[in-house]
Amino acid sequence: FNDEKGFGFITPESGPDLFVHFRAIQGNGFKSLKEGQKVTFIAVQGQKGMQADKVQAEA
């Protein structure tokens, strides 16, 4: 995830990587993801293909 650009990719357990935009990350404050961080999300059809939405960091 690139904090400066506000987007990155999620690698699901199966299937291709999914694009994720900072607006899709749930929560307050600065929205970012760390490499290797476990998350839950839903896959949705975006303008340029499948992408992650309603992304939440796992506790």
From Swiss-Prot:
The lineage of its organism: Bacteria, Pseudomonadati, Pseudomonadota, Gammaproteobacteria, Pseudomonadales. It holds the Pfam family CSD. One of its GO terms (molecular function) is DNA binding. Transmembrane segments: none annotated. PROSITE patterns: CSD_1 (PS00352), CSD_2 (PS51857). This is Temperature acclimation protein A. Induction: In response to low temperature. Its main location: cytoplasm.
